[in-house]
Curated annotation (Swiss-Prot):
Gene (UniProt): pqqE
Record InterPro entries: 4Fe4S-binding_SPASM_dom (IPR023885), Aldolase_TIM (IPR013785), Elp3/MiaA/NifB-like_rSAM (IPR006638), MoaA_NifB_PqqE_Fe-S-bd_CS (IPR000385), PQQ_synth_PqqE_bac (IPR011843), PqqE-like (IPR017200), Radical_SAM_PqqE_MftC-like (IPR050377), rSAM (IPR007197)
Protein source organism: Gluconobacter oxydans (strain 621H) (Gluconobacter suboxydans)
Protein known as: PqqA peptide cyclase
Subunit comment: Interacts with PqqD. The interaction is necessary for activity of PqqE.
Example GO BP: pyrroloquinoline quinone biosynthetic process
């Protein structure tokens, strides 16, 4: 039996607790409770198993990972194991003593999320008064510390016109990299698609803004587009079970953070099975790995080893079957569902459903 290549990255979702209430959150609709979270010893074992498996990077995420009092200890474990560590944070819980402790522990990089460039826009999306000022203060602390920093802006219908101002803020705060990431419509994003999905004109405007910023030079810019205006799908996390492994707060192991929407599937847990066994031989990770599972037209497509059939969770959400061709693809028999979603979601005003951790 030929084993798959090891994953490059581990997404360690330490907790679903978060002081923000973003309506596009990538967490599942059913949030895991604090009582179910893995303890420090178990997360340490997960990191050790990840390093042994061949993982190179660990991304500490959430929720808000800074809600975990053992974050510094886990960062130090990652350093001991020579795992590149990235903290994905809202910044609202970050202060100078905490940052100094993370720096001493060996943290390699911080991705700081912003909901908008205006206070009103940030509070409308994040739901936390004063969050924008805290984020700006956090960015200045990170810059002063010398830890490399990426600013992440999630964009959608309400803030997409402010992308140039996002770049201006990034330059002001001394970020080396900026990620302009359109909302991805899974989980909370899918629940709020009617309110958040931009028009094609807005998408094209955002692309022009990104291209103009890249032309200036001096700032590295990552750009993630929404699938709904495309005619070919993106590879799901670089291909299902090929590059990434995700561990939830309670220890469930997923090929991507949205996979739990797929029904009638057993999700293995690091408390019961080693990460190596899960990655190499579990039915879950082999379910859509490679190309043998593909239906037509994917099976005969020249792009099948580039996009790997697209997103299984999107196929599940829009067609009811995770094995179907990603409906974003213009060759998919279900492509009309994406076209209809775009048409239906162009309402001038829609209600936002906020992610609440109660």
């Amino acid at each position: 039996m030929t084993l798959p290549s090891p994953p490059m990255s581990l997404l360690a979702e330490l907790t679903h607790r978060c002081p923000l209430s973003c309506p596009y959150c990538s967490n599942p609709l059913e949030l895991e409770r604090k009582a179910a979270e893995l303890d420090t010893a178990t997360w340490t074992a997960v990191l050790e198993q990840a390093a042994e498996l061949g993982v190179l990077q660990v991304h500490f995420s959430g929720g808000e990972p800074m809600a975990r009092p053992d974050l510094v200890e886990l960062v130090s474990v990652a350093r001991r194991l020579n795992l590149y560590s990235n903290l994905i944070t809202s910044g609202v819980l970050l202060d100078e003593p905490k940052l100094e402790a993370l720096d001493r522990a060996g943290l390699d990089h911080i991705q700081l999320s912003f909901q908008d460039v205006t206070e009103a826009g940030a509070e409308r999306i994040g739901g936390l008064k004063g969050a924008q000022a805290r984020k700006v203060a956090a960015a200045r602390l990170i810059r002063a510390s010398g830890i490399p920093m990426t600013l992440n802006f999630v964009v959608h219908r309400e803030n997409v016109a402010r992308i140039p101002e996002m770049f201006a803020l990034a330059r002001e705060l001394g970020a080396g990299r900026v990620e302009i990431a359109h909302t991805q419509y899974y989980g909370w994003g899918l629940k709020n698609r009617e309110a958040l999905l931009p028009s094609r004109d807005q998408l094209e405007e955002s692309t022009r803004a990104v291209e103009a910023e890249r032309a200036k030079g001096g700032l590295s810019v990552d750009y993630v587009t929404p699938d709904y205006h495309a005619d070919r799908p993106k590879p799901c996390m670089g291909g299902w079970g090929q590059r990434f492994v995700n561990v939830t707060p309670s220890g469930r192991v997923l090929p991507c953070h949205a996979a739990e929407i797929i029904p009638d599937v057993a999700f293995p847990n690091v408390q019961d099975v080693t990460l190596s066994e899960i990655w190499n031989i579990s039915p879950l990770f082999n379910m859509f790995r490679g190309t043998d599972w593909m239906p037509e037209p994917c099976r005969s497509c020249e792009r099948k080893e580039r996009d790997w059939g697209g997103c299984r969770c999107q196929a599940m959400a829009l067609t009811g079957n995770a094995a179907n061709t990603d409906p974003v693809c213009s060759l998919s028999p279900y492509h009309d569902r994406v076209e209809q979603a775009v048409e239906n979601n162009m309402q001038p005003e829609s209600t936002l459903f906020y992610r609440r951790y109660t």
